[in-house]
Regions:
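N-terminal glycine/serine-rich phosphate-binding loop of ATP-dependent small-molecule kinases
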Residues: 1-54, 66, 111, 164
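A broad, structural surface signal
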Residues: 7, 11-18, 22, 69, ...
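Hydrophobic or amphipathic alpha-helical targeting/insertion segments
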Residues: 48-52, 70, 74-75, 80
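Residue-level structural signal for beta-strand termini and adjacent loop
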Residues: 57-58, 136
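Carbohydrate-associated surface elements
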Residues: 61
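Gly/Ser-rich phosphate-binding catalytic loop and adjacent alpha/beta segment
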Residues: 64, 74, 87-91
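Gly/Ser/Thr-rich active-site cleft segment
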Residues: 81-175
């Protein structure tokens, strides 16, 4: 298993931002926006209050290979799924990890309001708005042609309401 504490990401952002502002003399009033460039394909479950329920299961973590194979079988195999999502599902992909969480840590899965990646988590910490970017959503099960969550994901048993709304990386989130 390869996990990281999401509090470490937030602490690093806060410390780096404070150092940058101190070093440059820029005032918080002068900041017009913040952009994050982060690792993808991890999952950070948050509850309805925004509390983190479990460490980030990172992109390197392949614990869900059994679940990935089961999903591919249910959804018609590699060729059919790849045509819609653009890639077959593997054990490191978010959709497989969501099933793993549902099977192995049901209380975390059930208590989660949303599953966020690192980028979405940092945006949530800044704004209180839960989102996922199209650019990182392919491992969640994005229909790359329709730019929406794959309807076929319902066959996996994933609660689609736990997947955050999709946005472009250039969209403004919060104020």
């Amino acid at each position: 298993f390869v996990e990281q504490d999401p509090a470490d990401y937030w602490r690093a952002v806060c410390e780096a931002t404070a150092k940058l502002m101190d070093k440059t003399g820029v005032s918080a009033d002068d900041v017009k926006g913040v952009v994050f460039s982060t690792q993808a394909m991890g999952i950070i479950p948050i509850d309805k209050y925004g509390n983190v329920l479990h460490n980030n299961i990172t992109w390197v973590d392949g614990r869900a290979e059994k679940q990935a194979q089961s999903i591919m079988k249910k959804l018609g195999g590699k060729r059919i799924f790849s045509l819609v999502a653009g890639t077959p599902i593997m054990g490191k992909d978010v959709v497989a990890k969501l099933i793993w969480l549902k099977e192995e840590m049901p209380s975390v899965y059930n208590d989660a309001k949303y599953f966020l990646d690192v980028n979405g988590f940092l945006k949530f910490k800044c704004t209180g708005v839960a989102v996922a970017e199209y650019s990182g959503a392919s491992s969640y099960g994005l229909d790359t042609k329709k730019k929406t969550w794959l309807g076929a994901l319902k066959l996996t048993g994933i609660d689609m309401k736990k997947l955050p709304p999709l946005v472009k990386s250039t969209d403004m989130i919060g104020e």
